[in-house]
């Protein structure tokens, strides 16, 4: 999926996160994480984010994740929503989506 415009999804409530995405100027994936549980789960959050981007076919994005203790499924859902909004797609092909392990 091509990121066409900045977009975000989520809240700053406990057990949630805000994910913001925007097009990358140098065609790379950049993930910046701010989290209340970064020391314990930072590597796992980054892994979930990279896997979600791979499953969505995103090869170029700048992503900011502001996490307040969200579960992996919440993080993935917020990433999916932000990417879909940024890609300006109105319908998602769930039949071809690869679920995370």
Curated annotation (Swiss-Prot):
GO cellular component labels: cytoplasm
Coiled-coil ranges from the UniProt annotation: none
What UniProt keywords are attached to this protein's entry?
Answer: Cytoplasm, Phosphoprotein
Sites bearing O-(phosphoribosyl dephospho-coenzyme A)serine, chain numbering: 14
Out of the domains of life, which is the source?
Bacteria
Read off the Pfam families from this record.
Answer: ACP
- The protein's predominant localisation is cytoplasm
Subcellular localization: Cytoplasm
In UniProt terms, what function does this protein have? Covalent carrier of the coenzyme of citrate lyase.
HAMAP family, sorted: CitD
Question: Record's family?
Answer: Belongs to the CitD family.
User: Subunit composition?
Assistant: Oligomer with a subunit composition of (alpha,beta,gamma)6.
- Any idea what this protein is called? Citrate lyase acyl carrier protein
- Organism, by scientific name, is Clostridium perfringens (strain SM101 / Type A)
Q: What is the lineage of its organism?
A: Bacteria, Bacillati, Bacillota, Clostridia, Eubacteriales
**What gene codes for this chain?**
citD
